[in-house]
Amino acid sequence: MSFIPIVCGMKSFDSSYDTVPGHQNLYCPNCHNYSVGPIKRKEFFTIWFIPLVPVFWGKQLHCPICNWRQDFKNDEQLNKVIQEQQNLRQKQPN
């Protein structure tokens, strides 16, 4: 009888959501940097490094510094976050 190990895990594929300059460099509530941007994320369960079953498929705001993430469903939610960010920047003292 032979023993064949089954290697399984998770693999994520991130891609840019868009290249609009207003959607980049948003404020991160976790690390307090202006580095958050929207991404499209696909996460799969893998066996032998082959993606088989999709676990997550959606859009997120992502900070590459601290790896903070927040889901958003559509452009309306994204624009609401951007509007709130602009309000924060206007209220900051110089």
From Swiss-Prot:
It is found in: Cell membrane. Keywords: Cell membrane, Membrane. It comes from the Eukaryota. Present with 996 molecules/cell in log phase SD medium. This is UPF0768 protein YBL029C-A. It is a peripheral membrane protein. GO terms for cellular component: plasma membrane. Its main location: membrane. Belongs to the UPF0768 family. Transmembrane segments: none annotated.
